[in-house]
């Protein structure tokens, strides 16, 4: 996009003599400032005119969205910004960054340009001039000079400015200085703003930054460059899959700079020199040699400036996080990685735990991470906000009378890191130290990290670029667009045309429509409207005096069928509309009888809306849309002359039928009970999913396109169609689900888990546990075979003494397993699966471990071993589990008991066995079926009938009958009432005893502590005491090892042997090594437990002993002493009463 456009469409400003407003960028309503949406120069921005900006700045909405802090008042006339400072004391980011909350040290703080410095010094061009108009650029206005106390340290600020840019300003003040207005240039306290520097002035002094431009000498006496001779323009050329005016920090943007002569003469400039502080050589260097010292008069020097989105400050360099990324990218050599990455990885791992650290601590830690990598050598880190790639001197190629240069550049920091939605770019062009032109980019550049976003699809990205290349003809390819089955509107698919997509067997994928959206020009020359986006049923349309019609751009009627349909714009007048309507009537009639449903696209007027008055005429059309997906229509009356016959057309009922496109997973076990996900369209709650003829246990509609169903069990393995109850499948190839018979695998997995629970005490992965058991048993069995071959018969006890009790039990169990399998394999009539399962069950019961056997363990579907053995038809295994105490009425995820599966798979003997062990035949599962309802075998139904009869007979036996055999209701009720009274009296007795105990405990609190303390503490203390007694074991000296150990030799063994040893060795039943082994092992146990009691444990035992002693004393007090005292008191009182009575009697008699 060229910069040669009128400034009246860009900016306007108030001056001292005339009133002008400053134009601002106005964000379109379709614009999204996030990583999920791209930005287009033609679609997403429009530059507002001054008439719309009288109330305030147009960036108010954007500032409110990004929550800017410390911005100037929008009511003020914000000036432009002076060129940025090129000093080295700059910061990597703005200090008010919201994304990082960075608090930088003083040596890396951002130098801001105070917006107040530019008040009353703003000069903007008038609308009739363009940026390439050198005559306008040469016209300047003298600015008021003098001290201003509100600006503070403006002298220091001027000193920090780049002399390359400061020199032209000083040259512009020579006339003022000569008149005596100002004697010292440093007293000027207001920096020069943009677009007001005279371009025809030369620099009179040599700048300190001359080495950056490699000037051998500056020709200060050169004549000034005339601004009317050349015109400069810049254009951003978007690359493939790249949005214009939107980029990433890793992606180079391609810019095209053009220089042309206004008088059609040749341009003398041959090279464009990029800034040396922000330039990096390309990896693939050109083979052509670059000139070392070109003619300075043929070189144009480029100085970039990047402003924040609100134009309140200059962004000089990137933030700390982005600088760390640049350093990491630069440190790609192996030596640098080996030196830097180990420490960086450790610090990065530590940073993840700094969740509660303050922002200052986090920032200091980021700087520490940054210092792990070396600094950039070819780029100045203090001025690297915009980095250029390529040769330092870019050749200006001839293109007729113009010179063209292509420049690759990128912005190294994200917009959000600088607390702004976008950046403004300004390029200053110098020739022979004179400012030739200043190019202000027409639109801001947004730097987003959208390549990590999962919401923005590739098709949306390519759709944006396609809309830019052909804004008047938006075309959606066949492979990239599919219809929305709910609303009838075309929607973009998630995959681009060239991307591999996973195909399904659904019908709608095989009937993908070719949808082409094209836009024709409107009658108004200034009216330009494009279809922004069509996403699902929610869409939006820009304002345009046109309507939508279903026709082709060439006027040929469309084919509204499975082949696709086309949508273009037609005039909104009634005559043009009726003419096109007549062309379409014949086509609509011709396609009425076709099998594919018609998905009508609504006609609408200018604002793509319907009025309230005409709402009744479009009720049939609006019924196609779900209420959640309805767009918000704006009330606009429809023209009366428009024929609404097509609008009132009612779609067929088949369009509302639920459609299934895919099922995940599409296969599973015949036992069912697991959840599957069904994808499609038009789903709602209340649907019943059918797997063949069996309804799903649970069908829950998660959304209009997703259903979660619980797969029902099946009698046989195979493929069944998946449909909905009361809805016929409209597709030729319905979605299929495959049942697999993998009951053996499920049974093996659960059996291995039960075995692992017995051996290890924890539930583990069956595959991992089986590998461990096989490896352990293989090694143990090989060792057992080796020992049995090598050892003589009389040394068997010696070999066994090396094994522990658990090891011996495992060996015995392994031998029993081997013997069982061998015996079962010898009989060909037995089932190998059942024999293996029974051998595993025997291994669980025979193995001696500290852990208990648990045959009631369940898998993820809630099924136990009894469920699986009943389904597999293993009658002996089922009998074993019933005898082992498994719950015969255990329910799984479907609510089925083992009796359900035995009835489903027609295993009569297992049904009889379960019923005899207390299985209930009337249990109802999740599908509302009893075990008898699942069976198709008449013998099994007879078994259930007999069981029901026996249950009825057992119930009838409990009823009291009279002599005639009829039920005596009165006596039965009386017996029942007696039983109830007995139960109630038992409950009352229990509650009374509990209340008495509570009262006793309240009176004597020590009685409550006695049972609890004694029962909980005595066993542990007894164990401690038993372990402590092992310290007193001293069967043999510590320095005498057993004779078979590696520490013993013949002399030690002979010296350590005693008379008792020789006596035992003569006995053939007691081997010498066995006796030594027992003595040594006992001694080892004593040594190992010599420190069993720690001081803390000793103190705890003493405290518990005191508690027990006190509880015992209290018990003796309350159980013996208090009753004895009570009896003595009674006898004493009785004796005292008798004595008093006798005394009184004698007194009375004596009187």
From Swiss-Prot:
* Transmembrane spans: 1113-1133
Q: What are the Polar residues biased-composition ranges?
A: 87-98, 464-496, 517-532
Annotated GO MF terms: double-stranded DNA binding; transcription coactivator activity; transcription coregulator activity
- Compositional bias of type Basic and acidic residues: which residue ranges? 452-463, 1058-1067
Subcellular location, record wording: Vacuole membrane
Gene Ontology annotations for the cellular component aspect, listed alphabetically = cytoplasmic side of endoplasmic reticulum membrane; fungal-type vacuole; nucleus; vacuolar membrane
Q: Which Gene3D superfamilies does this one have?
A: Ankyrin repeat-containing domain, Immunoglobulins
Q: Where is the IPT/TIG domain?
A: 658-739
Coiled-coil ranges (or none): none
- Main localization, broad class: membrane
Signal peptide positions (record):
none
Any one GO biological process: regulation of transcription by RNA polymerase II
InterPro entries hit by this protein: Ankyrin_rpt, Ankyrin_rpt-contain_sf, Ig-like_fold, Ig_E-set, IPT_dom
Q: Know the name of this protein?
A: Ankyrin and IPT/TIG repeat-containing protein C26H5.05
Q: What is the protein's species of origin?
A: Schizosaccharomyces pombe (strain 972 / ATCC 24843)
Q: What is the lineage of its organism?
A: Eukaryota, Fungi, Dikarya, Ascomycota, Taphrinomycotina
């Amino acid at each position: 996009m060229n910069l040669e456009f009128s400034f009246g469409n860009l900016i306007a400003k108030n001056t001292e003599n005339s009133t002008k407003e400053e134009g601002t960028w106005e964000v379109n309503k379709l614009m999204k400032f996030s990583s999920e949406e791209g930005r287009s120069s033609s679609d997403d921005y429009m530059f507002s005119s001054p008439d719309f900006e009288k109330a305030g700045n147009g960036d108010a909405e954007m500032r409110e969205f990004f929550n800017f802090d410390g911005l100037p008042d929008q009511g003020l006339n914000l000036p432009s910004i002076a060129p940025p400072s090129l000093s080295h004391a700059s910061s990597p980011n703005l200090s008010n960054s919201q994304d990082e909350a960075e608090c930088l040290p003083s040596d890396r703080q951002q130098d801001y340009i105070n917006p107040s410095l530019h008040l009353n010094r703003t000069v903007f061009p008038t609308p009739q001039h363009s940026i390439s108009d050198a005559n306008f650029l040469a016209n300047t206005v003298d600015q008021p000079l003098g001290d201003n106390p509100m600006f503070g340290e403006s002298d220091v600020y001027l000193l920090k400015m780049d002399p390359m840019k400061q020199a032209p300003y000083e040259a512009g003040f020579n006339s003022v200085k000569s008149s005596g207005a100002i004697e010292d240039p440093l007293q000027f306290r207001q920096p020069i703003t943009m677009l007001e520097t005279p371009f025809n002035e030369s620099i009179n002094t040599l700048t300190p930054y001359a080495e950056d431009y490699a000037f051998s000498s500056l020709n200060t006496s050169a004549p000034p460059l005339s601004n009317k001779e050349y015109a400069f323009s810049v254009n951003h050329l978007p690359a493939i899959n790249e949005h214009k005016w939107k980029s990433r920090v890793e992606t180079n943007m391609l810019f095209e700079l053009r220089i042309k002569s206004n008088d059609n003469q040749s341009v003398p400039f041959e090279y464009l020199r990029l800034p040396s502080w922000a330039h990096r050589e390309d990896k693939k260097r050109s083979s052509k040699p670059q000139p070392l010292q070109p003619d300075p008069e043929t070189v144009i020097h480029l100085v970039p400036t990047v402003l924040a989105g609100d134009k309140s400050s200059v962004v000089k360099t990137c933030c700390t996080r982005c600088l760390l990324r640049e350093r990491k990218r630069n440190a790609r050599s192996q030596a640098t990685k080996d030196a830097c990455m180990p420490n960086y990885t450790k610090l990065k791992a530590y940073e993840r735990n700094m969740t509660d650290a303050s922002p200052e601590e986090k920032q200091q830690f980021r700087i520490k991470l940054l210092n792990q990598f070396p600094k950039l050598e070819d780029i100045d880190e203090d001025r690297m906000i915009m980095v250029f790639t390529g040769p330092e001197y870019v050749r200006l190629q001839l293109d007729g009378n113009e010179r063209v240069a292509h420049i690759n550049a990128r912005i190294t920091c994200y917009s959000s890191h600088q607390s702004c939605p976008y950046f403004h770019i300004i390029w200053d062009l110098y020739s022979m130290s004179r400012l030739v032109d200043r190019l202000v980019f027409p639109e801001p550049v947004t730097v987003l990290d959208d390549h990590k976003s999962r919401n923005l699809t590739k098709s949306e990205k390519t759709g944006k670029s396609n809309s830019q290349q052909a804004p008047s003809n938006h075309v959606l390819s066949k492979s990239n667009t599919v219809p929305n089955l709910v609303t009838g509107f075309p929607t973009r698919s998630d995959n681009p045309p060239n991307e591999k997509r996973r195909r399904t067997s659904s019908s709608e994928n095989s009937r993908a429509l070719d949808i082409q959206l094209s836009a024709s020009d409107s009658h108004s020359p200034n009216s330009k409207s494009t279809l922004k986006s069509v996403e699902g049923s929610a869409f939006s349309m820009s304002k345009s005096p046109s309507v939508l019609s279903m026709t082709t751009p060439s006027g040929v009627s469309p084919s509204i069928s499975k082949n696709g349909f086309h949508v273009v714009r037609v005039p909104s007048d009634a005559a043009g509309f009726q003419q096109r309507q007549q062309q379409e009537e014949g086509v609509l009639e011709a396609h009425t009888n076709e099998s594919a449903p018609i998905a009508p696209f609504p006609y609408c007027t200018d604002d793509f809306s319907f009025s309230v008055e005409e709402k009744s005429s479009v009720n049939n059309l609006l019924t196609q849309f779900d209420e959640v997906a309805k767009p918000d229509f704006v009330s606009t009356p429809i023209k009366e002359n428009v024929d609404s016959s097509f609008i009132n057309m009612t779609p067929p009922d088949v369009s509302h039928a639920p459609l299934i496109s895919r099922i995940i997973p599409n296969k599973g076990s015949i036992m069912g009970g697991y959840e599957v996900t069904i994808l499609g369209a038009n789903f709602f709650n209340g649907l019943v999913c059918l797997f063949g003829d069996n309804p799903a246990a649970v069908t829950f509609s998660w959304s209009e396109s997703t259903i979660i169903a619980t797969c029902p069990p099946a009698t046989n393995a195979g493929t069944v169609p998946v449909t909905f109850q009361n809805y016929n499948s409209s597709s030729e190839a319905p979605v299929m689900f495959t049942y697999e018979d993998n009951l053996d695998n499920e049974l093996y997995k659960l059996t291995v888990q039960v075995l692992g629970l017995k051996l290890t005490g924890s539930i583990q992965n069956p595959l991992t546990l089986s590998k461990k058991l096989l490896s352990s048993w293989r090694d143990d069995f090989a060792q057992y075979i080796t020992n049995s071959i090598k050892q003589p018969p009389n040394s068997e006890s010696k070999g066994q003494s090396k094994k522990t009790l658990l090891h011996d039990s495992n060996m015995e169990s392994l031998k029993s397993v081997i013997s069982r399998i061998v015996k079962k394999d010898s009989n060909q009539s037995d089932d190998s699966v059942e024999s293996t399962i029974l051998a595993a069950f025997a291994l669980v019961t025979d193995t001696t471990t500290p852990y208990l056997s648990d045959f009631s363990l369940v898998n993820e579907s809630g099924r136990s071993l009894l469920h699986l053995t009943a389904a597999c038809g293993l009658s002996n295994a089922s009998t074993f589990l019933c005898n082992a105490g498994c719950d015969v009425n255990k329910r799984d995820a479907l609510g089925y008991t083992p009796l359900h599966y035995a009835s489903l798979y027609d295993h009569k003997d297992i049904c009889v066995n379960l019923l005899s062990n207390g299985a209930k035949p009337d249990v109802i599962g999740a599908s509302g079926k009893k075990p008898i309802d699942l069976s198709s075998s008449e013998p099994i139904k007879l078994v259930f009938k007999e069981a029901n009869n026996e249950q009825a007979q057992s119930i009838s036996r409990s009823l009291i009958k009279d002599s005639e055999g009829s039920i005596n209701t009165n006596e039965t009720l009386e017996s029942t009432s007696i039983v109830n009274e007995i139960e109630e009296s038992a409950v009352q007795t229990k509650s009374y005893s509990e209340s008495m105990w509570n009262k006793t405990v309240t009176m004597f609190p020590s009685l409550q502590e006695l049972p609890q303390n004694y029962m909980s503490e005595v066993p542990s203390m007894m164990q401690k005491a038993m372990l402590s007694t092992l310290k007193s074991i001293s069967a043999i000296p510590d320095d005498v090892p057993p004779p078979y150990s590696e520490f013993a030799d013949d002399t030690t063994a002979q010296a350590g042997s005693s008379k008792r040893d020789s006596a035992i060795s003569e006995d053939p039943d007691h081997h010498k090594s066995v006796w030594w082994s027992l003595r040594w092992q006992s001694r080892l146990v004593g040594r190992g437990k010599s420190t069993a009691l720690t001081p803390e444990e000793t103190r705890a035992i003493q405290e518990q002993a005191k508690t027990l002693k006190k509880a015992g004393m209290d018990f003796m007090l309350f159980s013996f002493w208090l009753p004895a005292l009570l009896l003595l008191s009674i006898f004493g009182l009785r004796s005292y009463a008798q004595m008093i009575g006798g005394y009184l009697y004698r007194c009375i008699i004596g009187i």
